[in-house]
Regions:
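Short alpha-helical segments and helix-capping/turn motifs at coil-helix boundaries
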Residues: 25-32, 126, 191-199, 273-275, ...
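Catalytic domains of carbohydrate-active enzymes, especially glycoside hydrolases
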Residues: 25-50, 283-284
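Conserved, well-ordered alpha-helix/loop/beta-strand core segments that scaffold catalytic motifs
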Residues: 182, 186-215
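N-terminal regions that are enriched for targeting/export leaders
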Residues: 1-12, 25-28
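Alpha-amylase-like alpha-glycosidases and glucanotransferases acting on alpha-linked glucans and related
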Residues: 10, 16, 54-186, 215-440, ...
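Structured C-terminal cap/extension of enzyme domains
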Residues: 448-500
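Surface-exposed amphipathic alpha-helices with a cationic face
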Residues: 35, 193-203, 326, 350-351
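Outer-envelope exported proteins of Gram-negative bacteria
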Residues: 45, 206-208, 212, 286, ...
């Protein structure tokens, strides 16, 4: 990886006509702006379908794409919808906030209209055949789930819950149209994303995607393959994932995701993981692995506990996992999310893997000094962020942190006062100027937005994953400023360097 930079902007945060960011013309325009700004990467969040809580890290499938991201204008061009039909539904009226309730009640209705006009062809048939290993279970799962009012598979009758063949065959016959509807959604999603991804690559922009380490309990993955997880004889979790208590939370974090049966995964040579990562490498150019330390050891909380207090660290697969993956798939473009407290064994695993870890500027300013997140301490093989989707915006963070931290930050930046209208750019400057090979800046920091633009507050429910960039905010002035800073710190793509020397 050459010295470069990029922007973090979730697909759902793009501006668009229909309530949520999608694979619309605005996505293509954003790619063009990244190219003009001298960027090399567009980092996004997981693309999977979301449910209660709207988190892309709690998806109904590790393979499926979010149908909300299907561009309706493209379906109009294909003759599957009319513009009038698109305007008949209420997708929400706020340009800067996603109204998921309105999206849920409108998007599937309009997609159903498109599905009713859709005619299967050879391309569609090939897609269904090539993706049958996950698409068949996912479409059946969602169709059954809908028929039962949206409840999770563990609440279904035993015959379906335990996947008895007669019950599955009856469901396939009774729900044939609903199953086909979900296959249609995935076909359109994959077609549109593939076109956008190809366009981005053609403009010199690579996509950084995201693999959540865990899957949701309410998912096609757990229902179809319970042997992959730590379940009892009745397919209930024995233990679930989370984080132990720390200075930020006296009771820790109870994520609730099922834990992997690593013994089974090792016995099968991590075959499920290899298929999953291979699929991700079709969607993305670089993959960020969430919660990297979970492969060294994972925090196990007894199922049914209300807090994470009584959990314990258990050994994960370690480098055996990554050696096996590399043996099967070759050298991988992976970024390791290694934030938080790291043991010596995690650091050894990161070093052995050769993957770049993450550095976050907001974490740097412990008034005691010596933080590994201070830019002068970064290794070259790392990816620096001003903040991530789980942090406040830099402007929001600065105003909410304590005086000692603010004073240290100002001293480090070598200023007595930070300009309110420009605050985030001082921290972008620190990230860009660092030795870290790759610098990724969240869009909210490029726009110097406050805490109202925060994407997620971990361990909270409601109000997350809703921020959208308003149309026109990422304007020519900001694009030009980003380009100049990218040039200044020698992060421009090679083909752009020669043509810009005289200008600057």
């Amino acid at each position: 990886m050459n010295r470069a930079s990029g922007v973090l902007l979730p697909v759902f945060s793009l501006p668009s006509k229909y309530g949520i960011g999608c694979f619309s013309k605005e996505a293509y325009q954003f790619v063009d702006q990244l190219r003009e700004a001298g960027q090399s990467y567009w980092q996004i969040l997981p693309l999977g379908p979301t449910g209660y809580g709207d988190s892309p890290y709690q998806s109904f499938s590790t393979y499926a794409g979010n149908p909300y991201f299907i561009d309706l204008e493209t379906l109009v061009k294909e003759g599957l919808l009319t513009k009038k039909e698109c305007k008949e539904y209420d997708f929400g009226d706020k340009a800067e906030i996603i109204d998921y309730e309105k999206i849920y009640y409108s998007r599937f209705k309009v997609l159903k209209k498109a599905f009713e006009r859709f005619e299967k062809d050879e391309v569609y048939d090939n897609f269904v055949k090539e993706n049958a290993h996950w698409l068949d279970d996912y479409s059946l799962y969602m169709a059954i789930k809908d028929s039962k009012g949206g409840i999770s598979w563990n609440e279904w009758e035993d015959a379906l819950k335990n996947r008895e063949e007669t019950a599955l065959e009856n469901a396939r016959k009774e729900l044939v149209e609903e199953i086909d509807f979900y296959k249609f959604q995935q076909y359109e999603f994959n077609k549109q994303w593939s076109e956008l991804h190809t366009y981005a690559n053609g403009q010199g922009i690579q996509i950084i995607g995201d693999i959540p380490i865990y899957v949701a309990f309410d998912s096609a993955d757990t229902w179809a393959s319970p042997e992959l997880f730590q379940f009892d004889e009745e397919n209930n979790p024995v233990a679930v994932a989370g984080c132990p208590p720390d200075d930020f939370s006296a009771t820790g974090q109870l994520w609730g995701n099922p834990l992997y049966n690593w013994e089974y995964h090792k016995k099968t040579e991590y075959n499920w993981w290899i298929k999953r990562i291979r699929h991700c490498l079709k969607l993305y150019d670089v993959v960020r692995i969430d919660h990297f330390r979970g492969f060294d050891e994972y925090y196990s909380i007894p199922y049914g506990n209300e807090t994470a207090v009584d959990g314990a660290w258990m050994p994960g697969p370690g480098m055996d996992f990554f050696y096996t993956i590399e043996e099967r798939l070759g050298k991988l473009n992976i970024i390791a999310e290694d934030l938080g407290f790291l043991t010596e064994s995690v650091l050894q695993m990161l070093s052995a893997s050769g993957f770049p870890g993450m550095k976050v500027v907001q974490f740097a300013f412990d008034s005691n000094g010596g933080s590994a997140y201070l830019p002068h301490n970064y290794p070259e093989n790392s990816v620096v962020y001003t903040g991530t989707h789980d942090n406040d915006t830099t402007r929001g963070w600065y105003h909410s942190t304590d005086k000692a931290t603010r004073d240290f930050a100002k001293e480090y930046i070598n200023t007595q006062r930070l300009d309110e209208d420009d605050l985030a750019w001082d921290f972008i400057h620190l990230a860009m100027s660092s030795i870290a090979r790759l610098c990724i800046t969240p869009m909210q920091d490029l726009l110097n937005l406050d805490d109202k633009a925060r994407i997620n507050v971990p361990s909270t429910l409601g109000g997350n994953w809703t921020w959208r960039m308003e149309k026109g905010k990422f304007d020519e002035k900001t694009v030009e400023r980003l380009k100049r800073m990218t040039w200044l710190y020698e992060r421009l793509p090679e083909k752009m360097k020669s043509g810009i020397k005289d200008r600057y």
